[in-house]
Amino acid sequence: MTNTKYKRIVLKVSGEALAGEQGFGINPEIVKVVANEIKSVHDLGVQIAIVCGGGNIWRGVTGEQMGMERAQADYMGMMATVMNALALQDNLESIGVPTRVQTSIEMRQIAEPYIRRKAVRHLEKGRVVIFAGGTGNPYFSTDTTAALRAAEIDADVILMAKNNVDGVYSADPNTDPSAVKFDTLTHLDIINKGLQVMDSTASTLSMDNDIPLVVFNLNEADNIKKVVEGANIGTTIEGEE
């Protein structure tokens, strides 16, 4: 392994990032680019776990707004994350990266069930592991899944790969010209200031387990690799003080 800052990472890839500018569904070209970015990090010997969102296909809160029972709508969202995971797995394996998908809801014909010890073993053997299906429970986001899985597999960091967002700002930079980008924050800052990085459950879980986060722009070439190697890009969130 080369000298990287992080040895085992959880990469959170939002569904929106896989949709690209089309805004819905899976953009094949975007998935190819993301897969190649992941391969460049895998080639460094870094152990990579990925959590896929599903917002490019379905969101539980959308279903609830339509009058659906929230739990039912959330389960649909979990299925969406599996579709994204399978697309990413296919692209990674096509470029020579051994990849396993583990789902929190069993569907053995297409993926392994989530087993923590097996996931860690895959990582130790140099395989990428994609966690799909969220936590397997309604009312929990895929951000919370990322925090939970990072704690379970003892990851060094959670990389929050955003779609055309290069860090955390004091306000929306697209609408507020006075918005200031933060280079560093604490988990408590995120919670107390209500900054839109991840939901409060995920933030609290990350803080309680002392897991740092790096929020960065997925759309800039080599950014995942740069973060892993310790480059000062995006916003780093860690600690309580």
Swiss-Prot record:
SUPFAM superfamilies: Carbamate kinase-like (SSF53633). UMP binds at G54, D74, T135, G136, N137, P138, Y139, F140, S141, T142. GO terms for biological process: 'de novo' CTP biosynthetic process; UDP biosynthetic process. ATP binds at K12, V13, S14, G15, G55, R59, N163, Y169, D172. It holds the Pfam family AA_kinase. It is found in: Cytoplasm. Allosterically activated by GTP. Inhibited by UTP. GO terms for molecular function: ATP binding; UMP kinase activity. Pathway: Pyrimidine metabolism; CTP biosynthesis via de novo pathway; UDP from UMP (UMPK route): step 1/1. GO terms for cellular component: cytoplasm. Its EC number is 2.7.4.22. It is an enzyme of class 2 (transferase). Residues 20-25 are annotated as: Involved in allosteric activation by GTP. Keywords: Allosteric enzyme, ATP-binding, Cytoplasm, Kinase, Nucleotide-binding, Pyrimidine biosynthesis, Transferase. It catalyses: UMP + ATP = UDP + ADP. InterPro entries: AceGlu_kinase-like_sf, Asp/Glu/Uridylate_kinase, Uridylate_kinase, Uridylate_kinase_bac. HAMAP family: PyrH_B. Catalyzes the reversible phosphorylation of UMP to UDP. Homohexamer. PANTHER family: URIDYLATE KINASE, URIDYLATE KINASE PUMPKIN, CHLOROPLASTIC. Belongs to the UMP kinase family. This is Uridylate kinase. It comes from Latilactobacillus sakei subsp. sakei (strain 23K).
